[in-house]
Swiss-Prot record:
Reaction catalysis annotation: L-methionyl-tRNA(fMet) + (6R)-10-formyltetrahydrofolate = N-formyl-L-methionyl-tRNA(fMet) + (6S)-5,6,7,8-tetrahydrofolate + H(+)
GO biological process, one term: conversion of methionyl-tRNA to N-formyl-methionyl-tRNA
EC number assigned by the record: 2.1.2.9
Protein name, UniProt field: Methionyl-tRNA formyltransferase
Record function comment: Attaches a formyl group to the free amino group of methionyl-tRNA(fMet). The formyl group appears to play a dual role in the initiator identity of N-formylmethionyl-tRNA by promoting its recognition by IF2 and preventing the misappropriation of this tRNA by the elongation apparatus.
This protein's record includes keyword Transferase: yes
Length: 312
């Protein structure tokens, strides 16, 4: 049976691991160290570690694999293939070149578009109507390896980064399992990435999280769903942070200054730069838990003045 080392960390990686383990001999799982989570800073294992332990697979958690003694242990396993999915570290050539069939990665974009750590976020932020997953060779340069297979999936206005992560996680596992038989048999010729079409999905900055109400409504709508459920887009209300977790978009122009409020007893609408409307549905005022807008408008939101504007 084909011996595989799997490397991954978040929930996205779990379906890939479980599918691999159902058919192949996964001899080791490498994931990030346990990290403190939440206000109480409870030391929490990554989702992949939990899944690996349930499957009785040995787990490695080096802080930095490149300089870890565990690197030689992994090479000594003499695996036939290394598979990664959102592991979170650049891997050294000594490991990439050690398996018989090399090292491949499940990447959540249609490469060469969106190389980097936040491809799903950027597909939503940029208003794409489709994205997908790519199986590609691992090289030391970030997400630059030749492409082995690729599969597309639509993005709807109802999607956000969270829903797309779930869909792409399943799609990636399916594509990998469909690809591996021919790949291991040497029947697939990989395709180099077109350097003219390369784009990058770098980690989201704090500045990208802040809503600029002078921008068009569609752009703001894409920002909100592209940053939901993490790190979450925010604006300010009376100089205090105000997060918008979920919203809809109305392509009707009501007039009013950017950030102006149109509200009734149960709904809240905010004017964008082109006059179209953002309609928040789940929000989080400063110092409060997230809530639906109806709860906000029947509580603290009742005191909103028509002269109040978001972003001020």
């Amino acid at each position: 049976m084909t011996k595989i080392i799997f490397m991954g960390t978040p929930e996205f990686s779990v379906p890939v691991l479980t599918q691999l383990a159902s058919t192949y001999d996964v001899v080791a799982v490498v994931t990030q160290p346990d990290r403190p989570v939440g206000r109480k800073r409870v030391l929490t294992p990554p989702p992949v570690k939990k899944a690996a332990l349930e499957l009785a697979i040995p787990v490695y958690q080096p802080e930095k694999l490149r300089t870890s003694s565990e690197l030689e242990e992994l090479i000594a396993l003499e695996a036939d293939l290394l598979v990664t999915a959102a592991y979170g570290q650049i891997l050294p050539n000594s490991l990439l070149e050690s398996p018989k069939h090399g090292a491949i990665n499940v990447h959540a974009s249609l490469l060469p578009e969106y190389r980097g750590g936040a491809p799903v976020h950027y597909a939503l932020l940029d208003g794409k109507t489709e994205t997908g997953v790519t199986i590609m060779y691992m090289v030391e340069k970030l997400d630059a390896g030749d492409m082995i297979s690729q599969r597309k999936i639509p993005i709807t206005d109802e999607d956000n980064t969270g829903t797309m992560f779930d869909k792409l996680s399943i799609l990636g596992a399916e594509l990998l399992m469909d690809t591996l038989p021919d790949f291991l048999a040497g029947k697939i010729t990989a395709t180099p990435q077109d350097p003219e079409k390369v784009t990058f999905a770098r980690n989201i900055s704090r500045e990208q999280e802040k809503i600029d109400w002078t921008k068009p409504g569609r752009t703001i709508f894409n920002q909100i769903r592209g940053l939901s459920p993490w790190p979450v887009a925010y604006t300010t209300l009376e100089e205090k942070p105000f997060k918008i977790w979920e919203a809809t978009y109305e392509d009707t122009k009501e007039g009013g200054e950017p950030g102006a409020i149109l509200a009734d007893k149960t709904t809240l609408k905010i004017v964008a730069g082109d006059g179209t409307l953002i309609v928040p549905t789940v929000i989080q005022p400063a110092g409060k838990p997230k809530m639906d807008v109806h709860s906000f408008m029947t509580g603290a939101g009742r005191n909103l003045s028509k002269t109040t504007r978001f972003g001020e």
